[in-house]
Amino acid sequence: MTLRDVEKLRLWRLKIFRNQQPILRAKPPHASRKTQYLFQKIDNVKSQFGTDGKGDLLWQRDGMNPYHDLYDPGDLKTHRLSVTKLLTKSWCELRFAYDLYSRLPLFREAHLAAGERTHQKLENSEHTPVIRPQDIPQFSETVEIVEDDLHVLAASWAETITRLIHLFSSGDAREILCHGYLNKETNQLYDPMETEVWDPSQHILISGIIDHLTLTSKNGNLPLNNHHRSIDDSIAKLKNTRNEFAKNGLTIQISDVKTRTRKFIPPQESVQNATKLQLMYYRHFLLSLGTDSDNTYEMLLYNARIRGVDVDQPLNPANCLLIMIQMDGFVGDFVKLQNGDGFQFPKFDNAPISHSFTLADAKHHQFLQNINSHELAGQLLNGTFAKPITLRYFAMRLAQMYSMLTPLISEKLKVEYYHNNECFQEVEFVNDKKSLGESCRSASSFWFGKRAIEPVEATTFNYNQYCKHCDYRDHCAWIKDSLAKSTKLGDELTQIARRIHNI
């Protein structure tokens, strides 16, 4: 008879083996990939937190400051967090801290892959899948695409711009980039509506991706129609009709998609609260990004700079061609850049030009002859550009599009629960600014070492709801000691009750 991997793991967790350090570091033969992952993860955390006399993980770490402990102060690219990283109590904060200090990614379970497929299917149902270079054989054979941070960010911003325009023409947009800034001194989110001055030295970038935006109108009419493909025409019409938005009853609702392995929402209150807070962060970010387009333009440029990107470096010409093929609404804007026309955005129009730029290349002509290119595309392949195509341009257009959203964003937020690609339940709730502020202060205090870890309350109910599903359940001194104390207290109370009964 052979032992299953899980049985081997249980044997190796026995005290007799745990107390033997050479054996502790060894891996049981034929261990599964998940088992090996757990051994490595727990060993990593033990090296950071230490163990008690029983070999279990300690639950506090002296001088803990996750942001400084885990991110390189000399590397600007690491000077940011994600919205999900601020949800420190979505499960148990102790597990969250252990996972951080393990420095390992989450194990890729089957349900995570299934969830990603659902998100991708929903995205593809709303937006035409982006054409990849390998999808056009003559493209990869003719020109070279660059995939560094600059060009990945430019493509992401270009995609977000076109998706926001799509929102005003179709009523839906998915996978929308947003970001905000957290003041590490005050533990508050940056809010341009307040008197606080945005100081990059005090603010940490927080990034997020909104699953779903929905635009509705009382009269059923949307500001744009499918004929508005040009970026310039679309933004011009939105500007001209913005005063009519309120009259037409336009509203934008922010939603998050959660995938489930079964048709029920998570029973843990902390998980439900975290999802709501996630949406509140997104709402705050969209409001902030749309308040002042000039300020948002600067925030976007700073976002790029802390990633180590030069916002004035011209894009690789082949990447510009790819953007035109994927999103032909940009062709007209590129012609304006070539001619040196203004965009009625002084911060961009008056920015100094430090590089020359051209798309003129025999390879590009040859390539465009083999595809159904935009009628204006050929013009772009002749001569130099008065203004190069840079990240500054995309920051300007994205700032303008964000500014269209702010007056329309609803107080009502929504969670969409999916199972097997089907939405089985929607939960709608109202934004709670006070709860968001409290959560942000708590999360910031955790990340910058201003408070101790706050594990889930040690109760039998929580043990069944949280601890039984935790990777650290057999190594957690917090829950073991807490339950032992509660059991001892229960025994003492029972003895007292018996003595009283016998009096």
Curated annotation (Swiss-Prot):
Keyword Hydrolase carried by entry: yes
Subunit relationships: Monomer.
The protein's name: Exonuclease V, mitochondrial
UniProt cross-references to Pfam families, sorted A to Z: Exo5 (PF09810)
Binding annotation for [4Fe-4S] cluster: C92, C467, C470, C476
Cofactor note: Binds 1 [4Fe-4S] cluster.
GO molecular function: 4 iron, 4 sulfur cluster binding; DNA binding; metal ion binding; single-stranded DNA 5'-3' DNA exonuclease activity
Primary localization: mitochondrion
One Gene Ontology CC term in the entry: mitochondrion
Family, per entry: Belongs to the EXO5 family.
Cofactor requirement: Mg(2+); [4Fe-4S] cluster
Role, per record: Single strand DNA specific 5' exonuclease involved in mitochondrial DNA replication and recombination. Releases dinucleotides as main products of catalysis. Has the capacity to slide across 5'double-stranded DNA or 5'RNA sequences and resumes cutting two nucleotides downstream of the double-stranded-to-single-stranded junction or RNA-to-DNA junction, respectively.
Example of a GO biological process term: interstrand cross-link repair
Protein EC: 3.1.-.-
Cellular localisation: Mitochondrion
EC class name: hydrolase
Keywords assigned: 4Fe-4S, DNA-binding, Exonuclease, Hydrolase, Iron, Iron-sulfur, Magnesium, Metal-binding, Mitochondrion, Nuclease, Transit peptide
Organism: Candida glabrata (strain ATCC 2001 / BCRC 20586 / JCM 3761 / NBRC 0622 / NRRL Y-65 / CBS 138)
